[in-house]
Regions:
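Mobile "lid/hinge" segments at catalytic clefts and subdomain interfaces of large enzymes
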Residues: 142-250
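Hydrophobic alpha-helical segments, chiefly the membrane-spanning helices
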Residues: 296-302
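N-terminal leader/propeptide and maturation segments of large enzyme subunits in energy/redox metabolism
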Residues: 239-284
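Conserved small/polar residues in nucleotide/adenosyl-binding loops
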Residues: 285-294
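Glycine-rich, flexible beta-strand/loop modules in the N-terminal catalytic cores of phosphate-handling
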Residues: 25-110, 115-117, 122, 188
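Short, Gly/Pro- and small/polar-rich lid/capping loops
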Residues: 1-23
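Gly/Ser-rich oxyanion-binding loop with an adjacent helix/lid
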Residues: 107-161
């Protein structure tokens, strides 16, 4: 089902096309802001990755030469490796979104943002941040969002919301604020000796704008959002943590870790690890794996 949603954002129209492209992705949004166009997709594997104790999230921001009307010249016509800006943009997308996924979720998730057209007045980095949140929110991937991102610049002492590339590069402030409906969850900033009061004012301003974007995303989720899929929980049972605390007390752990000598600290941790492995060795072969438990719904909050 093809649908288009739009809202006014900093004097321009933000438009989101859903259902036009990337139909096989769990969630996809074709973002338009001015003449800048970014395709954001969210995909997840069907099964959790085994043997890991972290959430395998991958974020990509792909800058294409054709988006600015150029074709690579010379013998090699292929695109080069990701630029420093692309890597840093992917990290800024990752930081606010990663904590909003369930802690016991181990399915591989990829957020891909492909820049298709660039308008110097509308930075594609912002569209990628918003597009990733929208694509994930409307998908069936468990996610405790939505979240929204706003960038604030400062030119001649005045705030500029979602500034152009020139104002972003030459202004006195480069502030990126990501928020949920409840609080600010990420701040990244660079400034040219502005007052602390001005910085706080800019953060509050960005957070206020984020609330309008979140309301916009929630409206999309209510209309076209998919039901979040069931997944295999990879959380360690609380009973196991309690048993571990009986074998190694918090005081023992603090004494082992809080030492200035790295070699001593590593030896202490190795000894504690061996002690726990020996205590739980029999359970590894006689008890069912905690990963056999299945969660039917995602948590209600992050």
């Amino acid at each position: 089902m093809k649908k288009t949603y739009s809202m006014e954002l900093a004097g321009r129209t933000l438009s989101v096309d859903v259902g036009r492209v990337a139909a096989q992705a769990n969630g996809a949004a074709l973002m338009h802001y001015g003449d800048t166009v970014v395709l954001s997709t969210a995909t997840a594997s069907e099964k959790p990755r085994e043997g890991i104790d972290f959430f395998p999230l991958s974020v990509e921001f792909e800058e294409k030469m054709y988006s600015v009307g150029k074709i690579p010249g010379g013998f090699n016509k292929r695109e080069g490796k990701a630029s420093e800006n692309a890597v840093l943009t992917a990290r800024v997308i990752d930081r606010p979104m990663r904590p909003l996924f369930p802690k016991d979720y181990r399915n591989d998730v990829t957020l891909n943002n492909m820049v298709m057209s660039v308008d110097p007045e509308c930075r594609p980095e912002l569209l990628a941040m918003l597009g990733s949140a929208i694509a994930t929110s409307i998908s069936d991937i468990p996610f405790c969002g939505p979240c929204a991102t706003t960038q604030i610049g400062m030119v001649n002492g005045e705030f500029v919301v979602n500034p152009s590339q020139a104002d972003w590069d030459n202004g006195d402030l480069q502030l990126t604020v990501a928020s949920t409906s409840e609080k600010v969850i990420m701040i990244e900033a660079g400034a040219n000796e502005i007052k602390e009061e001005k910085m706080i004012e800019a953060i509050y301003k960005a957070h206020e704008i984020n609330q309008t974007i979140i309301a916009f995303i929630n409206n999309m989720v209510a209309e076209i959002g998919k039901e979040k899929h069931a997944y295999t929980s990879c959380a360690v049972p609380e009973e196991m943590f309690a048993a571990m605390r009986e074998i190694v007390t918090p005081a023992e752990m603090e004494e082992a870790v809080f030492t200035d000598v790295k070699q001593v600290r590593e030896e202490n941790i190795r000894a504690i690890t061996e002690k726990l492995e020996e205590a739980f060795a029999c359970l590894l072969y006689t008890s069912p794996s905690p990963r056999d438990r299945t969660r039917s719904r995602m948590p209600s909050s992050a």
